[in-house]
UniProtKB/Swiss-Prot annotation:
SUPFAM superfamilies linked: NusB-like
HAMAP family the record matches: NusB
InterPro entries: NusB-like_sf (IPR035926), NusB_fam (IPR011605), NusB_RsmB_TIM44 (IPR006027)
Keywords assigned by UniProt, alphabetized: RNA-binding, Transcription, Transcription antitermination, Transcription regulation
Molecular function per GO: RNA binding
A single Gene Ontology CC term: cytosol
PANTHER family: ANTITERMINATION NUSB DOMAIN-CONTAINING PROTEIN, N UTILIZATION SUBSTANCE PROTEIN B-RELATED
Protein name listed in UniProt: Transcription antitermination protein NusB
Superkingdom as given in the UniProt entry: Bacteria
Gene name per UniProt: nusB
Species classification: Bacteria, Bacillati, Bacillota, Bacilli, Bacillales
């Protein structure tokens, strides 16, 4: 499975977990839709779940005039996924994570999602790198 596909499927699983409180294993199975699983895909889903409190704190610290629970579910899932990659995936450059998140926002979010995701993640990336 290509990493871009793994990210899309991880986003679908995380969105489903966030919206419906479905068990992670069930969300993973549903997102895979009969496809063979992938280590990177599972790492993303389980990693975001395991570190969600820390990820949410980082994201919340970079929101201006927003609260995390008021952000669209899909945008919140994209932010969590990207911040997880930036912080916990040493083999992935932060710019790649940021660009992939913007592409996910363009594909799955509304017309303002990509700009919003870019702004939040750019600030987080700057903090991580300093």
């Amino acid at each position: 499975m290509k990493r871009r596909t793994a990210r899309e499927k991880a986003l679908q699983a995380l969105f489903q977990i966030d919206v419906s409180d479905i068990a992670p294993n069930d969300a993973i199975e549903h997102a895979l839709d009969g496809e063979k699983t992938d280590a990177f895909f599972e790492q993303l889903v389980y990693g975001v779940i395991e570190h969600q409190v820390q990820l949410d704190e980082m994201i919340s610290g970079h929101l201006v005039n927003w609260k995390l629970d008021r952000i669209a579910n899909v945008d919140r899932a994209i932010l969590r996924l990207a911040v997880y990659e930036m912080v916990y995936s040493d083999d992935i450059p932060a710019n790649v994570s940021l660009n992939e998140a913007i592409e996910l926002a363009k594909r799955f979010g509304d017309d303002k999602a990509a700009k919003f995701v870019n702004g939040v993640l750019s600030n987080i990336k700057t903090d991580i790198e300093s």
